[in-house]
Design a protein with these regions (language model features):
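Short pre-functional
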Residues: 62-74, 92-94, 177-178, 202
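C-terminal secondary-structure termini that scaffold catalytic or DNA-interacting sites
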Residues: 1-28, 36-39, 137, 214-231
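Conserved tyrosine-mediated DNA breakage-rejoining catalytic core shared by Y-recombinases
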Residues: 1-23, 42, 76, 80-118
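A short, glycine-centered helix-capping/turn motif at helix boundaries
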Residues: 67-80, 100, 182-184, 191-192
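Basic, Lys/Arg- and aromatic-enriched nucleic-acid-binding interface segment
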Residues: 42-75, 124-126, 172
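C-terminal catalytic core of Y-nucleophile DNA break-rejoin enzymes
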Residues: 34, 38, 98-118, 129-154
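Short, basic (Lys/Arg/His-rich) helix/loop patches that form interaction surfaces
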Residues: 50-57, 106, 126-127, 150-187, ...
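Catalytic-site neighborhood detector that most strongly recognizes the C-terminal catalytic loop/helix
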Residues: 97-100, 190-215
């Protein structure tokens, strides 16, 4: 027995792909795909940060970038942070539920804290909740979404002229690569893509990890062409 075809309001045959339920059962297009590391350079990351303005959304965006880049957090870990998970004096960030639900504490350098501080000041004026939240409208104070941040990274990178893939995990790769080049121990880097799993804390104290990262030198930042003196 043939099923009755779906028709639109004009009586024309309707494709199943036009129904909302059709796409709900489909996995995301990039599910299971693995992209090559190809981390962005310092110059590219800074260019993306400079492509934002000083409105609250831009200040928040720069804060998210430094947490992903200079602390090496996954996007899910960054968006799960609460204000109380940060210890600026100690230079530490507490990840309560990391990969495989593991709890860990990571360090973040002084330069990164200086770029997160403006958002921390603005965050105090918003409802209590996740560290990175929506700043306007009826959903003010609610957590940012991973999809929203990924889209903002992609769009802002295009504005900044960055032609490589610019996604949260690329910033995490950049964190690991830069620390390795700085001579920091792989035990400190704590990066799964460098074959560091649950073994990364064996034989090393968390205070040592945090101190090593907190004392990292600031990245070599190129001059901002917008503020360069004109001759």
């Amino acid at each position: 027995m043939e099923s009755t075809p779906m028709l639109d309001c004009a009586g024309r045959r309707r494709s199943p792909a036009t129904t909302s339920s059709f796409h709900q059962a489909l996995p995301p297009r990039n599910k299971g795909m693995r992209y090559p590391p190809d981390p962005p350079t310092v110059e590219e990351i800074v260019a993306v940060m400079r492509a934002t303005d000083d409105r609250p959304e831009g200040v928040r965006f720069r804060g998210i970038i430094v947490v992903l880049w200079r602390a090496g957090l996954r996007i899910s870990e960054a968006l799960a942070l609460n204000e109380t998970d940060l210890d600026p004096d100690r230079g530490s960030v507490l990840v309560r539920h990391g990969k495989n639900d593991k709890r860990r504490e990571v360090g973040m350098d002084r330069w990164a804290w200086s770029h997160l501080d403006p958002w921390l000041a603005l965050r105090k004026e918003l409802p209590v909740g996740r560290l990175f939240c929506i700043v306007r409208g009826p959903t003010r104070g609610r957590p940012c979404t991973s999809a929203g941040i990924r889209a903002q990274l992609h769009q802002t990178a295009a504005i900044a002229g960055v032609r490589r893939r610019f996604a949260p995990h690329q910033l995490r790769h950049a964190h690991a690569v830069e620390m390795s080049r700085e001579g920091i121990s792989l035990l400190v880097i704590q990066h799964a893509d460098l074959a560091i799993t649950s073994r990364y804390l064996r034989g090393i104290d968390s205070t040592e990890i945090i101190a090593a990262v907190h004392e990292r030198p600031a990245p070599m930042i190129p001059a901002d062409p917008r503020t360069a003196p004109r001759h």
